[in-house]
From Swiss-Prot:
Family the entry assigns: Belongs to the NAD-dependent DNA ligase family. LigA subfamily.
Its EC number(s): 6.5.1.2
Positions of the catalytic residues: K112 (n6-amp-lysine intermediate)
Function (record text): DNA ligase that catalyzes the formation of phosphodiester linkages between 5'-phosphoryl and 3'-hydroxyl groups in double-stranded DNA using NAD as a coenzyme and as the energy source for the reaction. It is essential for DNA replication and repair of damaged DNA.
GO cellular component, as recorded: cytosol
Protein name, as recorded: DNA ligase
Binding locations of NAD(+): D30, A31, V32, Y33, D34, S79, L80, E110, R133, E170, K287, K311
GO biological process: DNA repair; DNA replication
A family per Pfam: BRCT
Reaction(s) the record says it catalyses: NAD(+) + (deoxyribonucleotide)n-3'-hydroxyl + 5'-phospho-(deoxyribonucleotide)m = (deoxyribonucleotide)n+m + AMP + beta-nicotinamide D-nucleotide
Cofactor: Mg(2+); Mn(2+)
Residues holding Zn(2+): C405, C408, C423, C429
Alphabetized UniProt keyword annotations: DNA damage, DNA repair, DNA replication, Ligase, Magnesium, Manganese, Metal-binding, NAD, Zinc
Length: 672
């Protein structure tokens, strides 16, 4: 790289930094900044004579914007150096042990929350100031906004507070609050936020505290920055426990770990849990736990020597849109999917990302050949969340939405008030038929083992299956099945046996398998609890349907429309004629069921039953089964490797039972 190219790289990094730290409007993902920053570090190491005074390696951050009063930090809020793999983390541990002449070092390990760093100053136990990190030396006084956040104590919960206490923490927005905030923005025709961090930053820097007060912000303390008139605990971890006693929220996933291997184990464990957490984290912070050792190690130019951050695989990356394809879903929904230059994000290589619908394309202003930000977290489908307008090429072209179904050529329709455009072809459309069949045989529907996606596509393409009824006649086409790809004698026999077993099902699973729009598992269960006879359900008008718990006017309309269609009624008759049956249950009022009004959460690995089976049995006894633990949870069923849900239940004093306990409960009430 030439000297001029390095100067250009410095300018680019400074532009990124200004947008991120000053304007709170990131223009590239953290991973892009980190990659370019490491490149600059490498160049400066080779050519120290090229180092510039304005290089981001020579400073902490940017000067704050002029919208708020500037306040100096008593102790600088420095950045952290980064470890990017196990090897660099082990190198960090080796350096620490060498400097301390120690065989083993204990570290405090904490999730790195993806929010906005702040410093809170308390005098005689009362909050007097809240300041953003800013450039690390000074930040913006946002005290009025900070006071609107309920997780920030206005007064310490102690009769003997320190004379002065400065607490460092992170302001963030939980995922659920972010989704609700964006949904409200869409409803009101306002601009949506790109991600929870962007939403938290924008909310915290409102000039009107009343606006901030309406935003679902949370503050989590992560260190003591400065103290007078109080003897600080000997360890960082003990200090956080003390902050918790004084009324601060701290992260319940923080632990202490021994040596590099303990830190690596924690990283792997938390990386697995990352997607299931209720808030975003982008890595882990490791700190030497003993305060005396921290003081002994001291600081380097821009960071403490005793701490390091390790990032998770990036959940957002920048890439280019090569084109847009249009997929047809089970209910006919036309979904635009961006074809991308392959990019590594969220731990995998991504080459496609959803654009959701026509309205989302317009909202993003996305064009073919645009550079975009792609987001992927856990098992969530990758999506385009932002267009990098500054990098738009001259050959960018508009995305043209099809005027007819791209699969079957049928007309498209858009119901007033809905963003989704749908194909009107129904099961005549090959794409809808394939997706409907995949849903019909899925584990939570008819549960036909051995009938996977690829086999379904082959069966439809060869016109062996045209409706769900045809699945139950496959025994008559055994020779044809044997001639198909990867279908040997044992595979065919196993498939046909599974189809035969699936004929004996449950009423709620049968209704769910039909794929009625807006009818998920819970709604199917509610409908079949209210209507114990299929004929009664099929004949119910909308006024009767809305009497069912959790069934509103829209769901009732879709149920009625489904049963009004002759093709659907013929399919149901065909399935019953093919031998599909279920045990009829006596109608019982929900209030009469033994677990009525109770909320259960099931987590971890179970040996005698699957989690879904336990959930079904609990719901059959009247319980509500939730996917997350809260103060309203009545009981957690915890199997092996229960993880964060168990930790949260323990912190909330939620009753916990193991697999033996839930089996005893189900046995007591005759569910097994």
């Amino acid at each position: 790289m030439t000297h001029q190219q390095m100067l250009d790289l410095i300018q680019q990094l400074n532009d990124y930094s200004y947008a991120y730290h000053v304007k709170d409007e990131p223009i590239v993902p953290d991973a892009v900044y980190d990659r370019d920053y490491r490149q600059l570090q490498s160049i400066e190491a080779e050519h120290p004579e090229w180092i510039q005074a304005d290089s981001p390696t020579q400073r902490v951050g940017e000067k704050p914007d002029s919208g708020f009063t500037n306040v100096a930090h008593t102790v600088p809020m420095l950045s952290l150096d980064n470890a990017f793999d196990n090897e660099s983390l082990a190198d960090f541990d080796q350096r620490i042990r060498k400097l301390l002449n120690a065989e083993q070092v204990t570290y405090c390990c904490e999730p790195k929350l993806d929010g906005l760093a702040i410093s809170l100053r308390y005098e005689e136990g009362r909050l007097v100031r809240g300041v953003t990190r800013g450039d690390g030396l000074s930040g913006e006084d946002i005290t009025s906004n900070i006071k609107t956040i309920y997780s920030v104590p206005l007064k310490l919960r102690t009769k003997t507070p320190p004379a002065v206490l400065e607490v460092r923490g992170e302001i963030y927005m939980p995922k659920e609050g972010f989704e609700k905030l964006n949904a409200l923005a869409v409803e009101q025709g306002e601009k949506t936020f790109v991600n929870p961090r962007n939403a938290a930053a924008g909310s915290l820097r409102q000039l009107d505290p009343k606006v901030t007060a309406k935003r679902p912000l949370v503050m989590c303390a992560y260190s003591i920055g400065y103290v007078e008139g109080w003897e600080q605990p000997e360890s960082h971890y003990a200090g956080l426990l003390q902050l918790s006693e004084w009324g601060f929220r701290t992260n319940d996933l923080m632990i202490t770990a021994e040596g590099a291997q303990g830190c690596i184990d924690y990283y792997e464990k938390l990386n697995e849990k990352r997607a299931s957490l209720s808030y975003d984290i982008d890595g882990i912070v490791y700190k030497v736990d003993q305060i005396a050792l921290q003081n002994q190690l001291g600081f380097i130019a821009r960071a403490p020597r005793w701490a390091i951050a390790r990032k998770f695989p990036a959940q957002e990356e920048m890439t280019r849109i090569l084109g847009v394809d249009f997929q047809v879903g089970r209910t006919g929904a036309i979904t635009p999917v961006a074809r991308l230059e392959p990019v590594f994000v969220g731990g995998v290589t991504v080459s496609n990302a959803t654009l959701h619908n026509k309205d989302e394309i317009a909202r993003l202003g996305v064009k073919v050949n645009d550079f975009v930000i792609v987001h992927r977290a856990g098992d969530v489908i990758p999506k385009v969340v932002q267009v990098v307008i500054d990098k738009r090429p001259e050959n960018a072209t508009e995305v043209v939405f099809p005027e007819a179904c791209p699969v079957c050529g049928s007309d498209l329709e858009q119901v007033e008030g809905e963003a989704v455009i749908r194909c009107t072809g129904g099961l005549v459309c090959g794409a809808q038929l394939k997706e409907s069949l995949k849903h019909f045989v899925s584990r939570k529907a008819m549960d036909i083992d051995g009938l996977g996606d690829k086999l379904i596509e082959q069966l439809v393409d060869q016109q062996l299956v045209k409706t769900p009824v045809d699945i139950f006649t496959l025994s008559e086409k055994k020779d044809t099945l044997l001639s198909m790809e990867r279908m040997g004698q044992k595979s065919v026999e196993k498939l046909l046996a599974s189809i035969e077993i699936a004929k004996s099902t449950q009423f709620n699973r049968f209704i769910y398998s039909l794929g009625i729009r807006e009818v998920g598992e819970a709604t199917a269960r509610a409908l079949t609890s209210y209507f114990t006879e299929l004929d009664d359900l099929m004949a119910a008008d909308q006024e009767t349907l809305v009497e069912v718990e959790d069934v509103g006017p829209i769901v009732a309309q879709h149920v009625r429309l489904f049963f009004d269609q002759e093709l659907n009624r013929d399919t149901i008759k065909g399935l019953l004629a093919a031998g599909v049956v279920w045990e009829k249950k006596q109608q019982v009022s929900a209030d009469e069921l033994p677990l009525s009004g109770k909320t259960y959460v099931v987590t971890g690995s179970l040996s005698q039953f699957s989690r879904d089976q336990v959930k079904d049995k609990l719901q059959a006894l009247g319980a509500k089964v939730s996917g997350s633990v809260s103060a309203k949870t009545d009981c957690l069923v915890a199997g092996e490797k229960a993880g964060s849900k168990l930790t949260k239940a323990q912190s909330l004093n939620v009753p916990i039972i193991d697999e033996a306990g839930v089996i005893a409960l189900l046995t007591e009430h005759g569910a097994i």
